[in-house]
C-alpha cells in the first residue's frame, strides 16, 4: 500500500479530461469545471453569435424619410456602429465602403442600442424600446412599420431603427444565419435529459424564429444583460444548475452568474474573462460532448479516490501486522497505482477518434 494512488487519483483523470477536451477545442480554467458540468440540468444559449454564426449582413434598408439619401444615411449609421462592439454593428459597417464621419459623445446601452453625434446630428440607433426611450416617432404618411418589419422578424432577421431630431429616419434589416450544427447540438443535449433555452435581447418574433429552427421551444426575449443575469440567477435559486453559452459583452453578467459559463472562441474579451471555459473553435457540437465527457471524468475521479482509499485502508494494517509479505505489499502498491492509471484512461471511452 502506498499514497501514490491517492496522489494520482484526481490529477491523472483531470489530465486525461483536459487532453480530450482540448482536442475538441474546449479550454477550461480549473478542475472544478468538471464537477460542475457533470451536475448540470439546464443549458441556456445566447442567440446572436452563439446559435447563429455571428456573421451578420445588412439585408435591407428602408427609408422612412423619403427626402433622405440612402448612402448618406448608411454612412452615418456605419460611423456610429464602427465604435460598437456588438456583432450587429459589424454588418452595418461592412455594408459601407466609404469614409466614416467623426463621432463624438458616443454611448452604448447594452441590449438596447447606441447613440452619438455625427454631422451635427444626435443620432440614435437601436431596437424599438430604445427608440421609445428617446421619444422617436415615424414621420407622417409612412407605411405602418409593423407591417414592414413583420415578414423579416418571422424569418429570424433583426430589425434596427435609426433616427434623430425626434423622428425615425430608417429601418435596417440585419440577417445572421443559423449555425449548421445548432439543431443537432440541441437534439443531443435534449437526449441527455437537459432542458434547453435561448435568451436574447432581440424581440420575441425574431428570437422564436431562430429558436424554432434550432429545435428549441423555450424562448426568453428582449433581455438586457442584467435581465439575462437575473434570469439565470432566478433559475438557480429554484434549484437548477445552468450552463450558459454566450459570446458577447451582453452575455458577460450571465456567464459569470451561471453554474458553468462557456464563451465562444470568437467572442469579446469580457465574455472570455467571465466564462469558466472557452469554445476555441466556436463549434457548438462540442458542447454535448463536453457535458458527457465531464460526467465520465467525474465518475472516474470518484472511483479512483474510493479504490485508492480502499487499497490503503485494507493493506496498510495488514502490512503493519506483518501479515503481508514485502513482495506482496510491493505488488499491491503497484497494482493500486496501475488501477488508477487504467481507470483514468477509461474516460476516453466514447471519445471520437
PLM features: residue spans?
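A general beta-strand register signal
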Residues: 52, 108, 117, 124, ...
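Membrane-embedded transport module
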Residues: 275, 280-353
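Conserved beta-strand elements of the Class I
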Residues: 41-44, 124, 170, 243
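ATP-binding catalytic core of ATPases
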Residues: 62-114, 132-150
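Conserved catalytic phosphorylation-site environment of P-type ATPases
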Residues: 5-80, 235, 254, 347-350
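Hydrophobic alpha-helical segments characteristic of transmembrane helices
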Residues: 1-6, 312
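Conserved ATP-binding TGD loop and adjacent catalytic N/P-domain core of P-type ATPases
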Residues: 120, 140-142, 148, 156, ...
Amino acid at each position: 500500500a502506498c499514497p501514490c494512488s491517492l496522489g494520482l487519483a484526481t490529477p491523472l483523470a483531470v489530465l486525461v479530461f483536459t487532453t480530450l477536451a482540448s482536442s475538441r477545442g474546449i479550454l477550461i480554467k480549473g478542475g472544478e469545471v468538471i464537477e460542475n458540468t457533470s451536475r448540470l440540468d439546464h443549458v441556456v444559449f445566447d442567440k446572436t453569435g452563439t446559435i447563429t454564426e455571428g456573421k451578420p449582413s445588412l439585408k435591407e434598408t428602408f427609408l422612412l424619410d423619403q427626402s433622405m439619401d440612402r448612402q448618406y444615411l448608411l454612412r452615418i449609421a456605419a460611423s456610429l456602429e464602427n465604435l460598437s462592439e456588438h456583432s450587429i454593428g459589424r454588418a452595418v459597417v461592412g455594408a459601407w465602403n466609404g469614409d466614416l464621419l467623426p463621432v463624438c459623445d458616443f454611448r452604448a446601452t447594452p441590449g438596447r442600442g447606441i447613440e452619438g453625434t455625427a454631422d451635427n446630428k444626435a443620432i440614435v440607433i437601436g431596437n424599438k424600446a430604445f427608440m421609445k426611450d428617446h421619444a422617436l416617432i415615424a414621420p407622417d404618411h409612412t407605411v405602418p412599420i409593423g407591417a414592414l418589419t413583420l415578414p423579416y422578424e418571422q424569418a429570424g432577421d433583426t430589425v434596427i431603427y435609426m433616427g434623430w431630431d425626434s423622428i425615425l429616419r430608417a429601418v435596417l434589416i440585419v440577417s445572421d444565419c443559423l449555425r449548421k450544427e445548432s439543431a443537432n447540438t440541441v437534439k443531443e443535449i435534449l437526449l441527455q435529459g437537459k432542458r434547453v433555452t435561448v435568451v436574447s435581447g432581440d424581440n420575441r418574433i425574431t428570437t422564436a424564429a431562430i429558436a424554432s429552427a434550432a429545435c428549441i421551444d423555450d424562448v426568453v426575449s428582449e433581455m438586457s444583460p442584467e435581465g439575462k443575469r437575473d434570469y439565470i440567477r432566478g433559475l438557480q435559486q429554484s434549484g437548477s444548475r445552468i450552463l450558459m453559452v454566450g459570446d458577447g459583452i451582453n452575455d458577460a453578467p450571465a456567464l459569470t452568474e451561471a453554474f458553468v459559463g462557456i464563451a465562444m472562441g470568437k467572442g469579446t474579451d469580457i465574455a472570455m474573462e467571465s466564462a469558466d471555459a472557452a469554445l476555441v473553435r466556436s463549434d457548438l457540437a462540442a458542447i454535448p460532448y463536453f457535458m458527457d465527457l465531464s460526467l465520465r471524468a467525474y465518475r472516474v475521479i470518484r472511483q479512483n479516490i474510493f479504490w485508492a482509499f480502499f487499497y490503503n485502508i485494507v493493506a496498510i494494517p495488514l502490512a503493519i501486522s506483518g501479515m503481508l509479505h514485502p513482495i506482496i505489499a510491493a505488488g499491491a502498491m503497484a497494482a493500486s497505482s496501475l488501477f488508477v492509471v487504467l481507470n483514468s484512461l477509461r474516460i476516453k471511452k466514447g471519445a471520437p477518434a
